[in-house]
Regions:
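Periplasmic OmpA-like peptidoglycan-binding domain that tethers envelope proteins to the cell wall
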Residues: 24-31, 52-122
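Periplasmic peptidoglycan-binding/tethering modules of Gram-negative envelope proteins
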Residues: 1-48, 81, 85-88, 122
């Protein structure tokens, strides 16, 4: 008889955190999403993530790069402060406006591009 393999637990799905234009602070809607992400990290202590910051295309490359990095850093700090997630489990990376997921020619598209995403790493 063949051995029974236990079911594989699917990888958790993290919420995307959205930001207001040209802002780096976490708004109340973003905080609710971050709280869900914090619980995922708390319940899965083996997980490590890269916190990836992004911007829309408004403004200069230099400014957008700084904004994307600051957004990612603020998300990391929030998770450290509120959920006591250790520093070695979270890396931050800013991509500026180089990785849009929507059309930057529309207000709606720009709003989708102002975000922080979580990527699980080994």
């Amino acid at each position: 008889m063949a051995p029974v393999t236990p079911p594989v637990k699917p990888a958790p799905v993290f919420d995307t955190i959205y930001f207001d234009g040209n802002k780096t602070h976490i708004n109340p809607i973003g905080a609710k999403s971050l709280d869900r992400n914090g619980l995922i990290l708390k319940e899965n202590p083996h997980l490590k993530v890269v916190i990836e910051g992004h911007t829309d295309s408004m403004g200069s490359d230099v400014v957008n790069q700084k904004i994307s990095e600051k957004r990612a850093q603020n998300v990391k700090k929030y998770l450290q402060d509120k959920f006591n997630i250790s520093d070695d489990r979270m890396m931050v990376k800013g991509y500026g406006r180089t990785r849009p997921i929507a059309d930057n020619n529309t207000k709606e598209g720009r709003a989708k591009n102002r975000r922080v995403e979580f990527r699980i790493v080994p």
